[in-house]
Amino acid sequence: VSFLKDKTERNRLHGAFPHWLNGETGKTIAFSPKDNGADIVETSFLIEGLLIARAYFMGNGAEEQLRRDITGIWNDVDWNWFTKGENDGLYWHWSPDYGFDMNMKIQGFNECMVTYVLAVSSPTHPITRRAYNYWTSGEGYTDRVYNGYPIQASMFYTGPLFFVHYSFIGLDPKQMSDDYVTRGYWVRNVTQTLINRAYCLETAPKENRYSQVYWGLTASDIQGGYTASAPDNDHATVAPTAALSSMPYTPQYSMQVLWNIYNNYRNKMWGLYGPYDAFSLRYDWFANSYLAIDQLPI
């Protein structure tokens, strides 16, 4: 927190952080040619973690100062700036060199739910209710049925499982519902997990070798690269983070995957930090890598 407060203050843009920054100097590292400024989604993940820490460290002295520093960082973020003055949804990026040229509006149910929740609840620079409601626009807001499971506010075939992980590290879906997810976000997130599992067991090509102990599609390393695996983007690769980070939603089914990896693939899939990022039985491929954003939800 001291690093974020002291090293990044002059490099923050409207209080927001870049996608990447130098871990020693705090200066921005460009993620792409025009993505060399503020990233409000990555900022929201950081703020989510900081607010969790602020709620946990409730002591006096150093912990009291920690809470003040976190509050200062949280209050500095000008969420409303990222509506581009349109009062009609958030934009993902802003650059001091290119402005809003990337023009990527944030919409649909995905990992950005926490971005909208933090933006509308900011004590200093909140967006309006109208701007918040923009997330429901586009294909990401549709009631659908897959593999016998009805789901609210879903994109085509629900998307990767990290949609129900990243935002809900800090948000409690059991206490969330709105006009668009009337049955509540807990039911919605459980259902997305069950659909992901049901796709693997019932719908996916048999050659992919999915089973009750080998399922779970989400963003991960794959053989030869990286992708956001999902029922409509199936690369025959299971990422342990998919099922294991879904433990609150499907504890019994998720434990089956964990025990399978540990008991049957430990020599290939288990290292210092637990299970490696992904593996494919179809292609006899096993990652030897870790991705922090996959390990954290576990």
Functional labels for PLM-detected ranges:
Residues V1-P297:
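Ser/Thr/Asn(+Pro)-rich, low-complexity disordered segments
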